[in-house]
């Protein structure tokens, strides 16, 4: 008995008018763990747990005193016990109906519904994940704005690069101008050295001119003396009107001296003219040099102003470059945050894909389970209808048997003295009852064989029925006391039945609520499936967008790196250019300061030279006048000498 397998679930067809009391024995062991619960959920229509094999004691009824009035049928197995009481006229309205029947399948359904509710809760949590996806979409929009800012910053960088190129061109032009200025300054220095030499030459020429002028004056004075001597001799000769050889020799000698003096005077005049021409040329050159010096000073001032303007531009460009570097840093930070957000999007995408896969698998499994439950419900309804038909038949048979038993009990009460005959009659009746019970058991066995193979328990029930029939012989004497106890027990059982009916009604209402919730859950599942499909499509779109964003981010990173390298190179070039410009400017300042310090004395020297030149011009004019006068006197003397010679001849 103990080694037998656990009994399958029990299905009973009972008429609506017959009250049914079901006792289910539960084992004293602790409740099953989560794994056993999962197994029961997987099985769907699993077996009931075996209870401890303890038989309940049935009150003993002595023979001859058993009244089968209000007696019911009792059946007890290893795990179940069935008490069937006849319908009471007083309590017909409180009978158990077909809708009030509670089985373990409903408990299984309830557990499944609880699991469905848990799954619905998981679906709601997944809806929270969908809200998280919406937040991710907002983040992607923020990334788009960041990319627009990157594009704007790129445009600004391009504009700044163009401005830097223009500034670099201007710097190249300024460098060329500086080179030209250096060359011109070198020329000025050379010319300055030449001017010093020229000053020395001018001083030498001035001294030479003064010497020549002194010579010309001395020559003129001597020529004048000779002319005076000639005039004196000629006047003396005119007065004397005689010419001796000495006089002729004097005249010839004075004539020769005059000619020599005139020749020397002509030579000195020629040299003076050449010197004056050279002096005039040098003056023109000095004027030209002064003009060039003024032009160079203007160019230097212009170069200084341009240099200051370029320095201001360079300072502005440096500030712009610093701003651009700060923008690049911020953009790098934004790109880093965008990469981190893309990584988080990828991780969330993978997590959501995994959740979608699990959700699809759960949805498929739930749909299969729902279909199986619907099939099982339809099958159970058919089986319940069949069981109710069988229970009506059994009820009719039990009613007839009860009437016969009541009649026999009354006859046994009246015929207490004839116990042997009554015992034989009772034995016969019991044999008939046994045969009828055997028939009922055979029908029950057929019913059990239909549902989950109850043939193993049918033999046990037959043995128990035989034991009960043997016990009934001994319990007939105690029937009166047992009737009262039975009434009390029946009252308690009826109260329990009322409680069970109320519980069954509550369970039925809960079942209806669960059905309604199932419909709502199915609708929610359909909506969730449609939302899942929409989410899949949106995820695909987001994957494409993420790929495009990744490509754009890579391009922007490459461009930012190239721009940063270009900026670093431009910064280095600007630093080198600044250092070179500063060195050149310092050198130019030193040179200009030296030259200015040297040129500070030039105006005084030039003023003194101009004054000297003016004096020389005045002296030259006076000398020219004197020379013109001398030339006129010489021409007169020549004419006179010629005339005198002609007269002498």
Swiss-Prot record:
Coiled coil: 137-219, 247-426, 464-649
Keyword terms, alphabetized: Cell projection, Cilium, Coiled coil, Cytoplasm, Cytoskeleton, Developmental protein, Differentiation, Flagellum, Microtubule, Spermatogenesis
InterPro entries in the cross-refs: Odf2-rel
Cellular component GO terms, alphabetical: centriole; centrosome; cytoplasm; microtubule; sperm flagellum; spindle pole
Region annotation (Disordered) ranges: 1-65, 339-358
Signal peptide: none
Subcellular location, record wording: Cytoplasm, Cytoskeleton, Microtubule organizing center, Centrosome; Cell projection, Cilium; Cytoplasm, Cytoskeleton, Microtubule organizing center, Centrosome, Centriole; Cytoplasm, Cytoskeleton, Spindle pole
Any GO BP annotation: cell differentiation
Similarity comment text for this entry: Belongs to the ODF2 family.
Subunit structure: Self-associates. Associates with microtubules and forms a fibrillar structure partially linked to the microtubule network.
Role description: Seems to be a major form of sperm tail outer dense fibers.
Annotated protein name in UniProt: Outer dense fiber protein 2
Organism: Xenopus laevis
């Amino acid at each position: 008995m103990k080694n037998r397998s656990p009994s399958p679930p029990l299905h009973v067809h009972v008429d609506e008018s017959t009250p049914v009391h079901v006792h289910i024995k539960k084992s004293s062991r602790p409740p099953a763990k989560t794994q056993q619960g999962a197994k029961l959920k997987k099985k769907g229509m699993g077996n009931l747990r075996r209870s401890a094999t303890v038989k309940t004691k049935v009150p003993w009824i002595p023979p001859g005193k058993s009244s089968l009035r209000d007696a019911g049928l009792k059946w007890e197995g290893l795990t179940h016990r069935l008490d069937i009481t006849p319908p009471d006229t007083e309590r017909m309205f409180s009978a158990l109906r077909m809708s009030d029947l509670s089985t373990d399948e409903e408990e299984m359904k309830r557990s499944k519904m609880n699991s469905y509710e848990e799954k619905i809760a998981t679906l709601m949590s997944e809806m929270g994940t969908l809200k998280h996806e919406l937040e991710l979409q907002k983040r992607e929009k923020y990334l788009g704005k960041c990319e627009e800012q990157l594009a704007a910053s790129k445009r600004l960088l391009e504009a700044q690069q163009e401005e830097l190129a223009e500034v670099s061109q201007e710097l190249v032009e300024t460098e060329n101008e500086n080179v030209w200025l250096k060359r011109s300054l070198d020329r000025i220095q050379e010319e300055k050295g030449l001017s010093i030499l020229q000053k020395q030459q001018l001083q030498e020429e001035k001294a030479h001119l003064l010497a020549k002028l002194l010579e010309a004056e001395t020559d003129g004075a001597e020529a004048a003396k000779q002319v005076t001597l000639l005039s004196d001799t000629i006047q003396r000769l005119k007065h004397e009107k005689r010419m001796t050889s000495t006089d002729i020799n004097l005249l010839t000698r004075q004539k020769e001296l005059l000619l020599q003096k005139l020749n020397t005077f002509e030579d000195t005049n020629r040299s003076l003219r050449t010197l004056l021409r050279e002096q005039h040329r040098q003056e023109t050159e000095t004027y030209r040099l002064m003009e060039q010096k003024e032009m160079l000073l203007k160019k230097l001032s212009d170069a200084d102003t341009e240099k200051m303007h370029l320095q201001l531009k360079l300072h502005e460009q440096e500030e712009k470059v610093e701003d651009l570097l700060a923008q690049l840093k911020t953009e790098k930070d934004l790109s880093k945050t965008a990469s981190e957000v893309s990584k988080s999007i990828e991780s969330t995408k993978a997590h959501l894909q995994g959740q979608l896969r699990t959700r699809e698998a759960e949805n498929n499994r739930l749909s299969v389970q729902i279909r199986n439950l619907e099939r099982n419900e339809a099958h159970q309804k058919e089986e319940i209808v069949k069981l109710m038909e069988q229970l009506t038949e059994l009820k009719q048979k039990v009613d007839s048997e009860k009437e016969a038993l009541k009649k026999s009990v009354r006859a046994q009460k009246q015929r207490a003295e004839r116990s042997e005959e009554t015992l034989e009659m009772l034995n016969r009746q019991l044999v008939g009852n046994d045969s009828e019970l055997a028939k009922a058991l055979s029908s029950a066995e057929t019913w059990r064989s239909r549902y989950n193979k109850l043939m193993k328990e049918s033999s046990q029930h037959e043995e128990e029925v035989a034991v009960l029939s043997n016990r009934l012989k001994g319990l007939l004497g105690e029937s009166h006391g047992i009737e009262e106890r039975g009434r009390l027990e029946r009252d308690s059982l009826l109260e329990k039945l009322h409680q069970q009916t109320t519980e069954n009604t509550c369970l039925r209402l809960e079942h209806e609520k669960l059905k309604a919730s199932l419909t709502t859950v199915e609708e929610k599942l359909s909506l969730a499936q449609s939302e899942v499909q929409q989410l899949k499509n949106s995820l695909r779109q987001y994957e494409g967008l993420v790929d495009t964003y990744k490509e754009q981010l890579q391009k922007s990173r490459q461009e930012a790196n190239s721009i940063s390298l270009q900026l670093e190179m431009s910064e280095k070039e600007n630093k080198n250019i600044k250092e070179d410009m500063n060195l050149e400017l310092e050198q130019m300042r030193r040179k200009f300061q030296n030259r200015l310090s040297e040129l500070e004395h030039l105006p005084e020297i030039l003023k003194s030279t101009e004054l000297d030149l003016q004096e020389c011009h005045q002296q030259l004019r006076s000398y020219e006048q004197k020379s013109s006068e001398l030339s006129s006197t010489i021409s007169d003397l020549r004419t006179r000498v010629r005339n005198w010679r002609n007269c002498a001849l």
